[in-house]
Amino acid sequence: MNTMNRVEQFRKIAQDITDLYEIKDRCYGNSFGQTYEKLGIISAVTRISDKYNRLCNLATNKDIDNLGESIEDTLKDMAAYCIMTIREIRHNG
């Protein structure tokens, strides 16, 4: 795979994450930002850690019922939480 294909694939995945964020933001509003303002970085660490633990469970337990959440879904959620955390750090310090 050449560099442009990798960059194009990265851009597509980033757009998928943005689309997912937009849908969830309509459902949840700014609950992440509000919690971050109250509790700080630990609130973000907790959510990212939950997703990491979910990823580990999905990756190591083939018999687990994933309830419709695939490894890819979990990674997208984790990436979104990381980006949202960067946004909060830039906004709130």
Mark where each language-model region is.
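Intrinsically disordered, low-complexity regulatory regions
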Residues: 1-93
